[in-house]
């Protein structure tokens, strides 16, 4: 190879290396590492900057602000109560360094003079059913189990359907596994978010499609369809939300969601071929829709949810002498920080009632995470998904 060819090859290698490291070009496991020293497009600073030692630097240019603080899921694993203040420099740039943090994804906001907002310099932000927040991705030495690895990938299709229940157009996302065969009947997991989530949050925050791809590649789960369902069927701040949402959601499943999925995909169209699961409010939908609809579902995943008065709200299910015969799998999970706090009162109330009536279930508590996406991703990968359809 002559000198010109060698120089060209080296230049090409450098160019390709730089190209591969650009944020938002590839589905990188370390998109906030700042490998090129470039400021994100339309931003004025690099924030957050995630270092290989798992420390994180946040920056905000706000010369007229009187206070800036960090609020987010990382404070739970740090054992910090309340927000973490920034320090203001003479140049008007506020800075905060935290960590090292465990490898994970964290949601956060900045609190500027008492006003909570997404980080204006962070290109990773959530699209959700509540005011937006920013994403912090603390990387390890390579792709994690929630990342897009070099494995066969399934597909996610967004469908729009008309609901006679809500009398409008609604969306549903359906994951099909790698090597999906439209002639083969698959079991279906119907997966829901919480009070502030949209179906797409299970992909972008929950990474459920990548988690499922990786579990299948590792031989740890059964191939299945996953329907990401919009369980926002009445405004969350409606004064009768708690009284109406469960009945409306049951109708939505019976009259719209399940008929749509069964008519567009080849499914195992019986209770043993269906699972229902959700986080927080979606976990309560799982309880108060799913456990009251044993003609539809036989598998249940209750994530970060429960009830203080299950004898009244779930009396028919609890007193059914054939409940264990009708239920293939009942999973209950929460984060370690949740188990020590407010949310555990409902979870414990639900578990105590199940124990009293001899109803079988599996309980799974993960790490020191709180009421956030870190908990729900971990519960899917380590707990719920590997156990589905194994009975």
What do the predicted segments below correspond to?
Residues 1-23:
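Bacterial Sec-dependent N-terminal signal peptides
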Residues 21-39, 43-81, 88-391:
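Non-catalytic cap/lid and distal C-terminal segments of serine-dependent acyl enzymes
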């Amino acid at each position: 190879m002559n000198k010109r060819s060698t120089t060209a090859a080296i230049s090409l290698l450098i160019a390709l290396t730089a190209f591969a490291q650009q944020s938002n070009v590839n589905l990188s496991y370390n998109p906030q590492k700042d490998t090129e020293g470039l400021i994100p497009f339309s931003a004025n600073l690099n924030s957050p900057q995630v270092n290989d030692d798992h420390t994180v630097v946040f920056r905000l240019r706000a010369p007229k602000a009187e206070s800036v603080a960090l609020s987010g899921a990382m404070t739970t694993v740090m054992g910090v109560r309340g927000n973490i203040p920034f320090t203001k420099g003479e140049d008007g740039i506020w800075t905060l360094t935290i960590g090292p943090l465990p490898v994970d994804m964290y949601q956060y906001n900045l609190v500027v003079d008492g006003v909570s907002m997404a980080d204006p310099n962070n290109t990773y932000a959530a699209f959700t059913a509540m005011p937006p927040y920013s994403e912090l991705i603390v990387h390890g030495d390579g792709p994690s189990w929630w990342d897009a690895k070099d494995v066969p990938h399934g597909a996610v299709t967004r469908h729009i359907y008309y609901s006679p229940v809500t009398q409008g157009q609604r969306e549903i996302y359906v994951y099909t596994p790698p090597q999906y065969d439209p002639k083969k009947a698959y079991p279906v997991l119907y997966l829901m978010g919480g009070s502030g989530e949209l179906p797409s949050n299970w992909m972008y925050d929950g990474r459920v499609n990548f988690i499922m791809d990786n579990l299948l590649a590792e031989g740890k789960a059964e191939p299945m369809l996953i329907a990401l369902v919009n369980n926002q069927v009445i405004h969350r701040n409606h004064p009768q939300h708690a009284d109406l949402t469960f009945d409306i959601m049951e109708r939505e499943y019976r009259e719209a969601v399940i008929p749509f999925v069964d008519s567009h995909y080849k499914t195992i169209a019986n209770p043993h071929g269906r699972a229902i699961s959700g986080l927080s409010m979606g976990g309560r939908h799982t309880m108060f829709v799913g456990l009251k609809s044993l003609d539809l579902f036989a598998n249940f995943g209750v994530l970060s949810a429960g009830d203080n008065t299950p004898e009244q709200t779930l009396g028919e299910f609890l007193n059914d002498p054939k409940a264990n015969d009708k239920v293939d799998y009942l999973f209950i999970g929460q984060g370690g920080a949740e188990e020590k706090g407010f949310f555990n009162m409902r979870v414990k109330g639900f578990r105590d009632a199940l124990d009293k009536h001899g109803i079988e279930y599996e309980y799974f508590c993960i790490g020191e995470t709180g009421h956030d996406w870190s908990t729900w991703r971990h519960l899917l990968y380590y707990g719920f998904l590997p156990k589905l359809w194994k009975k």
